[in-house]
Amino acid sequence: MALNSINTNSGALIALQNLNSTNAELTQVQQRINTGKKIGSAKDNGAIWATAKNQSATANSMNAVKDSLQRGQSTIDVALAAGDTITDLLGKMKEKALAASDTSLNTASFNALKSDFDSLRDQITKAASNAKFNGVSIANGSTAKLTFLANSDGSGFTVTAKTLTLTGLGLTASSTFTTAAAAKTMIGTIDTALQTATNKLASLGTSSTGLDTHLTFVGKLQDSLDAGVGNLVDADLAKESAKLQSLQTKQQLGVQALSIANSSSSAILSLFR
């Protein structure tokens, strides 16, 4: 049988403990709703917090990987654009050489064709030398290969440079013709240069496709990591909202229970009146 005492009100103590517990839960739920996270710090759940932090760091590092791969794409795109121009120039050079191989031409016409040929040749040098992105080129012979970031561990994606200069295509800065016979020979030389150029551009195209594919993969991997971190630490706001309402009701009842328990001491005093 419970004793009635004015020194120790066990009912009030129990009611106060329950109310404090409810208030603590309520504070936690409100914090989750305010931050949107169920794990906001290591004290909430050390193991999950550490895992989430590591995965989040990996996901964030993927931004550097994506930036590097995108630079790679742009570098190749510039080289491909220069290559398109160069193959067009080679085609026009072949046309001039073919026309100049006509032995029925007069000297003025032949010289005009030769001048056009030489001008087109010099434009190849300009196109190759200007094929740079952010000061870097894989078309002008300044580098043998470029390696871009492929993953957060620092591994790389290597692109082999394809020199599209005159030398890289089997020509020289003095490649020309002075006779119809030499012009005829030059046709074969230009055909070889064209084949070399298209082979190199095809290889760059394959590298570009590889970069595109890997960049897409990195984006999906980053999204998966972000989603995984969210699953670990994000709060279920619908669930927390329902819990908030329940705890608020429980808090109100706890306050009433504490008030009732505290009134028992007054009831004991009334017995002595």
Curated annotation (Swiss-Prot):
Pfam family, one: Flagellin_C
GO annotations of cellular component type: bacterial-type flagellum; extracellular region
Gene3D superfamilies, alphabetized: f41 fragment of flagellin, N-terminal domain
InterPro entries in alphabetical order: Flagellin, Flagellin_C, Flagellin_N
Keyword field contains 4Fe-4S: no
GO molecular function: structural molecule activity
Main location: secreted
The entry's keywords: Bacterial flagellum, Secreted
Subcellular localization(s) per the UniProt record: Secreted; Bacterial flagellum
Family note: Belongs to the bacterial flagellin family.
Function: Flagellin is the subunit protein which polymerizes to form the filaments of bacterial flagella.
Complex and partners: In C.crescentus, the flagellar filament is composed of multiple flagellins of 29 kDa; 27 kDa and 25 kDa.
Protein name: Flagellin FljN
